[in-house]
Amino acid sequence: MSASAESTNATPYGTLPPTAAASARKPISLPRLLEMHARGEKLTMLTAYDATFAAVADAAGVECILVGDSLGMVCQGLSSTMGVTLQAMCYHIESVARGLRRAQATAWLIGDLPYGSYHESREQALRSAAALMQAGSHMVKLEGGGWTADTVRFLVERGIPVCAHLGLTPQTVHALGGYRVQGKTQESAALMKRQAHELQDAGAALLVLEMVPAALAAELTRELTHCATIGIGAGKDTAGQVLVLHDMLGINLGKMPKFVRNFMTGAPGVKEAMQAYVAAVKNGSFPDNTQHAW
């Protein structure tokens, strides 16, 4: 490889811009993520549930690794995320954190608060969040709208960074009537906007938007001034993107979600597939609003 190729972090599937290459070499912190967002650089996130895949994702240039409660479906064989326990989350976060430390990785590690671990009270949420942080998380993620704002504020005031989650929230999929696009009507879009601003005002620094119309997600991304949006099935104009590891590697025995691209296609290995994902998000070729969004 030539010196110029090395300096721009070229991969077989695209070239990361110099800012992305620099970000991959330096430890990722929350201020750093928000600085990247402020200068217009797309953020990348993937799920990982074990030490090896987490280390490979970091080596591929992924800035944020999410130990999601999706592990219930892709690792434990559950039919939904609602059966995942706090103990299981801590186990997988510990595994991922060890892998990242061993690899001297730079990625920012986020852990999902599982169903039932933060619903009872702010104090319950603090105990659960503390368990995830002690397991190795840098940030916790929780699902829900305005009712979670008080909990978000309570955690942030105690030094725990929070990622919020609106749109399709898998922990409440039964109440939503299934895995459906959220925010399609004028009323539901207005509600989501209000909730997003409430969560930002409470201190949420990141906000996952799942299965949200691309136009609404773009509008929210423009409106939120100190909270970076991370899309999954929310179009290309969010501040960043996240996919479930197994989906983007094509490891799915069922129907692949519309918003997923199989990055293993044509890739010689897992790391190269992850590099292709990072490059595609950074250069704006993924997601494609005509194929992967509503």
UniProtKB/Swiss-Prot annotation:
Cofactor note: Binds 1 Mg(2+) ion per subunit.
Pfam families documented for this protein: Pantoate_transf
GO terms for biological process, alphabetical: pantothenate biosynthetic process
Metabolic or biological pathway: Cofactor biosynthesis; (R)-pantothenate biosynthesis; (R)-pantoate from 3-methyl-2-oxobutanoate: step 1/2
Enzyme class label: transferase
Binding site for Mg(2+): D69, D112, E143
One GO CC annotation: cytoplasm
Keyword flag Cytoplasm: yes
Compartments where located: Cytoplasm
Residues annotated as the enzyme's active site: E210 (proton acceptor)
GO MF annotation list: 3-methyl-2-oxobutanoate hydroxymethyltransferase activity; magnesium ion binding
InterPro entries from the UniProt entry: Pantoate_hydroxy_MeTrfase, Pyrv/PenolPyrv_kinase-like_dom, Pyrv_kinase-like_dom_sf
Keywords of this entry: Cytoplasm, Magnesium, Metal-binding, Pantothenate biosynthesis, Transferase
Main location per the UniProt record: cytoplasm
Cofactor requirements of the protein: Mg(2+)
Residues reported to bind 3-methyl-2-oxobutanoate: D69, S70, D112, K141
Region named Disordered: 1-21
Compositionally biased spans, kind Polar residues: 1-12
Family stated for the protein in its record: Belongs to the PanB family.
Described purpose of this protein according to its UniProt entry: Catalyzes the reversible reaction in which hydroxymethyl group from 5,10-methylenetetrahydrofolate is transferred onto alpha-ketoisovalerate to form ketopantoate.
Record-linked HAMAP family: PanB (MF_00156)
Protein name as annotated: 3-methyl-2-oxobutanoate hydroxymethyltransferase
Gene source species: Albidiferax ferrireducens (strain ATCC BAA-621 / DSM 15236 / T118) (Rhodoferax ferrireducens)
Lineage: Bacteria, Pseudomonadati, Pseudomonadota, Betaproteobacteria, Burkholderiales
Gene assigned in the entry: panB
